[in-house]
């Protein structure tokens, strides 16, 4: 389709429109073993993408119970892939990360900030 001498992109109905939708219902193994080195303190300085996560507490009742894998992280949000793709604000939620056989709870307020800067913190 043409408009103002520019061709529009074809938005096919089967093409994913949001980031991560192509990954839904696919089996993925995101992380290996942490070898017992992951604690609450080290998780704050760690890469979160690929970890299994669950929202255990939130000021918005519709967010409680969402679980899946972290597929993207920004300064203020975590993008979680489960039965669908959610963008969860960090500031309003408390997360439970599953690392190996351990479950680590972290308030979202502790995670707020650019991921690359959080990794540099000591």
From Swiss-Prot:
GO MF entries: ribonuclease P activity; ribonuclease P RNA binding
Family the UniProt entry places it in: Belongs to the eukaryotic/archaeal RNase P protein component 1 family.
A Gene Ontology term for the protein's cellular component: ribonuclease P complex
Chief location bin: cytoplasm
Compartments in which it is found: Cytoplasm
Organism lineage: Archaea, Methanobacteriati, Methanobacteriota, Thermococci, Thermococcales
Record field: catalytic activity: Endonucleolytic cleavage of RNA, removing 5'-extranucleotides from tRNA precursor
Function: Part of ribonuclease P, a protein complex that generates mature tRNA molecules by cleaving their 5'-ends.
GO biological process: rRNA processing; tRNA 5'-leader removal
Keywords: Cytoplasm, Endonuclease, Hydrolase, Nuclease, tRNA processing
Subunit structure comment from the entry: Consists of a catalytic RNA component and at least 4-5 protein subunits.
Protein name (record): Ribonuclease P protein component 1
Protein species of origin: Thermococcus sibiricus (strain DSM 12597 / MM 739)
Keyword Signal applies: no
Enzyme Commission number(s): 3.1.26.5
Matching SMART domains: POP4
Keyword Repressor applies: no
HAMAP family: RNase_P_1 (MF_00754)
Signal peptide, first to last residue: none
InterPro entries: RNase_P/MRP_Rpp29-subunit, RNase_P/MRP_Rpp29_sf, RNP1, Rof/RNase_P-like, Rpp29/RNP1
């Amino acid at each position: 389709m043409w408009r103002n001498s520019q061709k529009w992109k074809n938005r096919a109905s089967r093409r994913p429109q949001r980031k991560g939708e192509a990954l839904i219902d696919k089996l993925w193994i995101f992380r290996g073993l942490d070898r017992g080195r992951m604690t609450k303190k080290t998780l704050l300085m760690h890469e979160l993408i690929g970890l299994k996560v669950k929202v255990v507490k939130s000021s918005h009742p519709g967010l409680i119970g969402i679980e899946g894998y972290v597929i993207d992280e920004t300064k203020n949000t975590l993008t979680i892939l489960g039965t669908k793709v959610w963008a969860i604000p960090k500031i309003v939620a408390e997360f439970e990360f599953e690392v190996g056989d351990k479950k680590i709870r972290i308030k979202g307020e502790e995670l707020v900030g650019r991921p690359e800067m959080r990794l540099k913190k000591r």
